[in-house]
């Protein structure tokens, strides 16, 4: 079983090794014209950012309050993601599903989530908007968790878990496009690393709190509400960042109509 689960990652690793290059100039699957256009576009973007920033050090990325704010946003989405991974099978089992049924049922929301993520990311790119795509996705996931805490049938809990999966999956692409809107170079590398490191702590806190709360209450409901609160907080933080960006002409954080 473990070998079968590892095979897709092994195959993908080989594909990435040969096809995912570090620069457009090395991408053999692009035409010469496409490589030249991408290189020029990246250089133009870098010059535009450099003109607005006196320096772009790693420390600048770590000290930027927007980085810490996005880390908090990612904390909430990570809490939701790992809650699904760890507790969804147990929640489904509590409605009387067999082990085989749990395997199939648990896979369904993930398939829908992948489709939603692709469509939502394309819509975000097409509209050149980031903030509300993250906000809407986080609120959908929060609503799904609240719904999951109040359902009484296997069908309704699957609907709830699908909503959560769709929301969390859809939030990722627009969220990860945000740091490079105001950081570049070493600052971007440090900032993204900080967001990832701090945010991933949510993957520990969310599932742990569900277990702790379930031991105290005998139910999953209040634990799910707790994680829903973290996702709602993520949405609120993005709202605040967007409002600040709209008020300040020099603030380069994702607000409506920013690419």
What is each stretch, according to the model?
Residues 30-50, 241-259:
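Intrinsic disorder in cytosolic terminal tails and internal cytosolic loops
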Residues 2-18, 224-239:
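Symmetry-related core transmembrane helices of the 12-TM Major Facilitator Superfamily/SLC fold
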Residues 59-121, 172, 176, 206-207:
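Extracytoplasmic gate region of multi-pass secondary transporters
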Residues 128-178:
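C-terminal transmembrane helical hairpin of 12-TM major facilitator-type secondary transporters
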Residues 3, 75, 107-111, 193-201:
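Transmembrane alpha-helical cores of Major Facilitator Superfamily
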Residues 179-189, 218:
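Paired intracellular helix-loop junctions of major facilitator superfamily
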Residues 99-100, 185-195:
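Loop-to-transmembrane helix entry/capping segments in MFS-fold secondary transporters
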């Amino acid at each position: 079983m473990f070998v079968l689960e590892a095979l897709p990652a092994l195959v993908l690793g080989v594909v990435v090794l040969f096809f995912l290059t570090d620069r457009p100039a090395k991408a053999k699957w692009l035409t010469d014209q496409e490589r030249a256009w991408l290189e020029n576009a990246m250089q133009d973007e870098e010059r535009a950012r450099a003109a607005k920033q006196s320096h772009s050090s790693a420390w600048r990325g770590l000290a930027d309050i927007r980085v810490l704010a996005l880390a908090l946003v990612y904390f909430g989405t990570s809490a939701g993601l790992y809650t699904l991974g760890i507790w969804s099978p147990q929640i489904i089992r509590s409605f009387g599903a067999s082990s085989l049924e749990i395997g199939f049922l648990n896979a369904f929301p993930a398939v829908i989530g992948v489709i939603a993520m692709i469509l939502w990311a394309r819509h975000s790119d097409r509209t050149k908007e980031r903030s509300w795509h993250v906000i809407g996705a986080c609120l959908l996931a929060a609503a799904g968790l609240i719904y999951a805490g109040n359902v009484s049938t296997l069908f309704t809990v699957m609907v709830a878990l699908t909503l959560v999966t769709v929301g969390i999956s859809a939030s990722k692409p627009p969220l990860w496009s945000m740091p490079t809107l105001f950081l570049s170079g070493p600052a971007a590398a440090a900032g993204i690393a900080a967001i990832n490191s701090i945010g991933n702590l949510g993957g520990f806190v969310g599932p742990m709190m569900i277990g702790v709360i379930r031991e105290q209450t005998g139910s999953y409901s209040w634990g799910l509400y707790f994680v829903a609160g973290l996702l709602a907080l993520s949405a609120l933080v993005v709202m605040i960042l967007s409002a600040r960006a709209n008020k300040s002409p020099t603030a380069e954080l994702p607000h409506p109509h920013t690419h």
